[in-house]
Amino acid sequence: MAEEEIDYNSQPCHAYACRIQDCLQRSGYNESKCTKLIDELYECCAKFYMSKGEDARSTSCPKPNLLKLKIQQRESKDVDAVLLEFAKK
């Protein structure tokens, strides 16, 4: 049985996810340089779930419960710096 091919370009919020990947590659995977783009993706995903329901899925969005956690974490002003310092050790 063949797996169904996913058209990623038609996935909700896919363009935001691609912008993050481009930013991470350009910045040497320094997440703090891409903060605005990450926030934009999460905002897009939140709108997606609000309009389609929490059972909806997009390959570009975390599942609703993880998205809520990620948004809460990003509200912490030190989240990027902490992650970068941890990664350096």
Swiss-Prot record:
The coiled-coil regions, if any, are: none
- Cellular component terms, GO, for this chain's entry? mitochondrial intermembrane space
Keywords from UniProt, A to Z, are: Disulfide bond, Mitochondrion, Repeat
Report the domain of life of the source organism: Eukaryota
* Localization per Swiss-Prot or TrEMBL: Mitochondrion intermembrane space
Q: Where is the CHCH domain?
A: 10-52
Q: Which InterPro entries does the UniProt entry name for this protein?
A: CMC4 (IPR027179), Cys_alpha_HP_mot_SF (IPR009069)
Principal subcellular localization:
mitochondrion
Disulphide bonds annotated for this chain are: 13-44, 23-34
- Motif (Cx9C motif 1) spans which residues? 13-23
What PANTHER family does the record tag this protein with?
CX9C MOTIF-CONTAINING PROTEIN 4 (PTHR15590:SF0)
The name of this protein is: Cx9C motif-containing protein 4, mitochondrial
Q: Which gene encodes it?
A: CMC4
